Amino acid sequence: MLKMSGSYAPVEDSADELSVHSGNDNEIDLEKGLLPKCNTGNGGTTPCSEPPHYDSDAVVEMDMYENNIYMQTFKLRPFPKSGVTNFSNVVFQMKTYENNRHMQTFRLRPFAKNGVTNGVKLAQVLFLLLPFNFIFIACLFFRKASFTDFSLMGWILFGIWCLTCFLSSFILYAYHESWTKFARERPDDFAGILILLLFPGIVTMIVFYGIYMNSIYG
């Protein structure tokens, strides 16, 4: 039997000193493993202290692969289900809802009963149309115009003028509730719309008056 002595040699287990010596006195790191072999030129190989040389094509392919991965992380994905609320979409939807609600307050409702009598409606319509027509009629009476002096083109223009005035009066009368409310809340926009509505009649009136004066005075 072998008798064990009572003295023991200390065991060093530090991570910094974990190393194994090979037969050629080259230190091998247990964590990194064996060093790569390098060609010595005489047919033998020795461990290299530097990393091996990589092929340039392999490096380029590696860079391209990394770039593709990088681009894929930022690729555009429509309507991603990320669980995060898109603030811009919420704001856009709220503005759209407000605009729709705002437009519904001015929707056209023909012959709506807003508590105004028919006489008041007719008076307001005539008040809007008479200033434009009064100028034209006054010019005709000032020149002592007569319907017998109208040419065919004059009668056509006169008919267009009367039709424009009638349609404008009917629209203003039928949609009295809508345009009066619009005029109270948005007077600038209403003035522009009124001018556009009466513009054909105004142009026809001016052209008609010019043709009539030309037929009389040459």
UniProtKB/Swiss-Prot annotation:
Keywords: Membrane, Transmembrane, Transmembrane helix. One of its GO terms (biological process) is meiotic drive. Residues 1-23 are annotated as: Disordered. It is found in: Spore membrane. It is a multi-pass membrane protein. GO terms for cellular component: cytoplasm; membrane. The chain crosses the membrane at residues 122-142, 152-172, 191-211. Belongs to the WTF family. May act in meiotic drive. This is Wtf element wtf7.
